[in-house]
């Protein structure tokens, strides 16, 4: 349902993201049916955000200058009521990154935060082994998502071998995906942009169902791509193709979702 809505609306989605993934992010959004813009100047954002359906802040390329950009973008988005997704890249890997992320969370309106287990744990004062942007897997990702949702007061998406989404203290675990996805730089970053493109389509009561569909579609597209290739280089191409081709019926038939209690 939400895939069709996105494709019919072709929503403008602004992505302030890291330098490594801009091309991949734009192509992924285009394949799904959104309209990406990589605007990085406050005056330009002032012009574009009134027409924008979602904003991604990805802190991968972090400097004092980009920190100021994030804050300016969030201020403008709040003025125009644009929902925002925060992707706190490597928030658990160092004090500076954690400080910036917590500043954004505490002083700006964030609609949803997406990260791996180590990143999300760092935001609520917990510790999970991290190495740069990577984190060790944990046994109970649903419990971590619930704690983060409760403490941060906003929807939380955790991605990894199993994904978890928590909205209003309700949690779902999602078990689709491909082992090749972590071998392609930017699959997590692109997901943050995808969430930003979709989030406006749901109200508070339907957001959990929307996020379940989006996360499932994204991971099932990875499975579809793996059926075409076992090599990471060509997987990236097939993944974009699968995002373009995937239909809601395939998501409904193949999704693996557990309602966490």
From Swiss-Prot:
EC category name: transferase
EC number: 2.7.1.50
Positions with a binding annotation for substrate: 38, 186
GO biological process, one term: thiamine diphosphate biosynthetic process
Residues the entry annotates as binding ATP: 114, 159
Catalytic reactions of this protein: 5-(2-hydroxyethyl)-4-methylthiazole + ATP = 4-methyl-5-(2-phosphooxyethyl)-thiazole + ADP + H(+)
Cofactor(s) the protein needs: Mg(2+)
UniProt superkingdom: Bacteria
Gene Ontology terms, MF aspect: ATP binding; hydroxyethylthiazole kinase activity; magnesium ion binding
CDD domains: THZ_kinase (cd01170)
Transmembrane segments: none
UniProt keyword list: ATP-binding, Kinase, Magnesium, Metal-binding, Nucleotide-binding, Thiamine biosynthesis, Transferase
Pathway(s) of this molecule: Cofactor biosynthesis; thiamine diphosphate biosynthesis; 4-methyl-5-(2-phosphoethyl)-thiazole from 5-(2-hydroxyethyl)-4-methylthiazole: step 1/1
Pfam families: HK (PF02110)
InterPro entries associated with the record: Hyethyz_kinase, Ribokinase-like
Summary of the function given for this chain in its UniProt record: Catalyzes the phosphorylation of the hydroxyl group of 4-methyl-5-beta-hydroxyethylthiazole (THZ).
Similarity annotation: Belongs to the Thz kinase family.
NCBIfam families registered for this protein in UniProt: PRK09355.1 (NF006830)
Protein name, per record: Hydroxyethylthiazole kinase
Gene that encodes it: thiM
């Amino acid at each position: 349902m939400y895939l069709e809505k996105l494709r019919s609306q072709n929503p403008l989605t602004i992505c302030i993201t890291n330098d490594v993934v801009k091309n991949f992010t734009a192509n992924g959004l285009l394949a799904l049916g959104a309209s990406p813009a990589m605007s990085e100047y406050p005056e330009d954002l002032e012009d574009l955000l009134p027409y924008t359906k979602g904003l991604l802040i990805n802190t991968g390329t972090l400097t004092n200058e980009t920190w100021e950009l994030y804050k300016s973008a969030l201020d403008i988005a709040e003025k125009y009521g644009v929902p925002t997704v925060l992707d706190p890249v490597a928030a658990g890997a160092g004090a500076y990154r954690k400080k910036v992320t917590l500043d954004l969370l505490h002083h700006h309106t964030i609609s949803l935060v997406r990260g791996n287990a180590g990143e999300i744990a760092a935001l609520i004062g917990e510790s999970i082994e991290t190495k740069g942007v990577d984190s060790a897997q944990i046994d109970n990702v649903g419990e971590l998502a619930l704690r983060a949702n409760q403490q941060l007061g906003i929807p939380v998406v955790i991605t990894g071998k199993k994904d978890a989404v928590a909205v209003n203290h309700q949690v779902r675990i999602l078990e689709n995906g491909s082992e090749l996805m972590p071998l392609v730089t930017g699959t997590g970053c692109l997901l943050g942009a995808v969430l930003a493109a979709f989030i406006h389509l749901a109200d508070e009561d339907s957001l959990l169902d929307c996020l379940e569909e989006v996360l499932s579609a994204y991971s099932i597209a990875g499975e579809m791509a793996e059926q075409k290739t076992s090599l990471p280089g060509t997987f990236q191409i097939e993944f974009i193709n699968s995002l373009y081709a995937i239909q809601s019926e395939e998501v409904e038939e193949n999704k693996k979702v557990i309602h966490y209690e």
